């Protein structure tokens, strides 16, 4: 299920650089992580939903690219973000 507008605003307020920030890597990674977690739960119940699985893999790849960019340009922000999101890196 897609993220509601309220949930997106809450995530952006917590992880964005300012309240209306939607473009920073932190905000984008946080939104992708939330969508990835929702889709992972969906796929636990619907194992043969290959169309959604492909979308999940695309989102994971996009998040990996954003994290790689952040790690290359600002390691402190990268480390802070992965610890706040609970990612395993």
Swiss-Prot record:
Organism for this UniProt entry? Corynebacterium aurimucosum (strain ATCC 700975 / DSM 44827 / CIP 107346 / CN-1)
Q: What is the lineage of its organism?
A: Bacteria, Bacillati, Actinomycetota, Actinomycetes, Mycobacteriales
GO biological process per UniProt: translation
InterPro entries reported for this sequence: Ribosomal_uS15, Ribosomal_uS15_bac-type, uS15_NS1_RNA-bd_sf
Homology family: Belongs to the universal ribosomal protein uS15 family.
Functional description taken from the UniProt entry: One of the primary rRNA binding proteins, it binds directly to 16S rRNA where it helps nucleate assembly of the platform of the 30S subunit by binding and bridging several RNA helices of the 16S rRNA.
Quaternary assembly: Part of the 30S ribosomal subunit. Forms a bridge to the 50S subunit in the 70S ribosome, contacting the 23S rRNA.
The name on file for this protein is Small ribosomal subunit protein uS15
The keyword RNA-binding is assigned to this record? yes
